[in-house]
Amino acid sequence: MFKRAVLGYLVLRLLTALSFLVFAGSASAQTCPLNGTLSNKLVCQIPQVYGAFGFGTATDPTQSVLYTGDHHSAHFSSGFLSSFAPINEAVGIQASQLPIASPSSGITFVYDPVLKTFAPSTDESLGPIVGNRATTIGKHRLFLGFSYQYFNFGSIDGQNTSNIPAVLQHQAFPVPNPQHIPSCDNQTALTTANGYAGAPCFVRDFIQTSNNIDLTIHQYTIYATYGITNRLDFSVAIPILNVQMAVTSQATIVPNSVVPAAVGAPGNVWHSFNLTNPVLASQCASQNPCLNATFSDSGSATGIGDVVLRGKYTVYNGERFAVAAGVDVRLPTGDELNFLGSGATGVQPFGVISYKARISPHAEVGYEWNGDSTLAGTNIVPAPAGTTPTNTGKLPNRFVYIVGADIRVVKRLTAAFDIYGQRLFNSPELVSQPYMGLGHCAGPTDPTGATCGTYTAGTTHPDIAQITTDYNITEASLGLKYRLMGRLVITGNVLLKLDEGGLRSNAVPLVGISYNF
């Protein structure tokens, strides 16, 4: 008993010290400047998919993605930021708060009056996989576990991650201006409300994009639980993540205005992709003007995630029915800019009820309060003109519930089923919001480019927008536990998506192994 107590104490001290050590050394917030400097942080993969300047203008014209002749420099930067920032924020927030298996479910010990000691229970199941039971593992008992989960995200808020549409609108353009480009003579659809009143004809141009975000996460988690008393457990869960992300964007410039021939722009359009950019040279070789291009970026990161500390106390422990209360504390030990962590402390009080039998039902409810994180701020990328960026913002709070049962199929085998649900509050969500074009102008044009000529009304194009709302994330957990030998238990489980909220995989497989000392 003394050796087991010392072992448990040393293991928990080591794991807890490690978690605080990583917390103390976590990375400070950085941004994706889009000023020619590339960042290797995964949070910058989406903003940098078009290169180090995005759709901005580089000092060296050959580094600009868009053609920047003497007549007019391209102005799509703010449109780019406003269209893609919601995707980046949603991916960052939701990929950094992944579910983990229960840190202390396994073999339970009951007092044997004949042996006058605690012995493994033979008439109970091996416990839940995602949920918890109200009983503890016993005084000076130690539970060690390891699990692996694989996340292959296929949708975000119901949007297929292989085809996320986004329209990049032209910025408002003042008149008068240094280029002496006059207002469009046909101001239809150019209004004060949308910021285009008095603008030149070329603000009708836009860029339609279709975007594929390939995001996978391998999660390896180490668990330890130690019984302080017969009613009080302390647990620590340390996840180690490998995050792989690849972004591909197919972009098409839609020219809705004609540049005067005297200006000499490629194809007599105001906006086109830059033929002199080395990245675009091969794609644009057969196009004049170059209006279609594909861009890509990829990266990966490996490191410790957010460490979770748990204390659980059994308030009532009857012959079969038990009630417990506890608290989870999530430490921001993972690098949020690489989607390894949330960047914020989270505190979740919870309550558990469970019943001990061959079929053992259990239920858990909790509410998590989250702090501020860089991921929820507006300073990841340069802020659009006229806005004030914030370094951090509040991560959404959430209500969590788990309801299910574990069934002792045979002496060594347990089947577990749970409904795992979350309700996120004041959380960013992507929604489909079609873009209404500003119409099309066709020649003839005069030398100033102010004449619209023949005007055709605009049509709708697929686009996304960000709203702040409350939504649900619901999953079903199906799994098996098998006692391989003695106190060694192996686990297999799968989480199945039941609704469309959040960043989701259709199925999340889990394998694990644990041992009770």
PLM ranges: what are they?
Residues 156-161, 247-253, 325-328, 335-343, ...:
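Outer-membrane beta-barrel translocator domains and adjoining extracellular loop/strand segments
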Residues 126, 130-133, 144-148, 222-228, ...:
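Residues on the lipid-exposed face of transmembrane beta-strands in outer-membrane beta-barrel proteins
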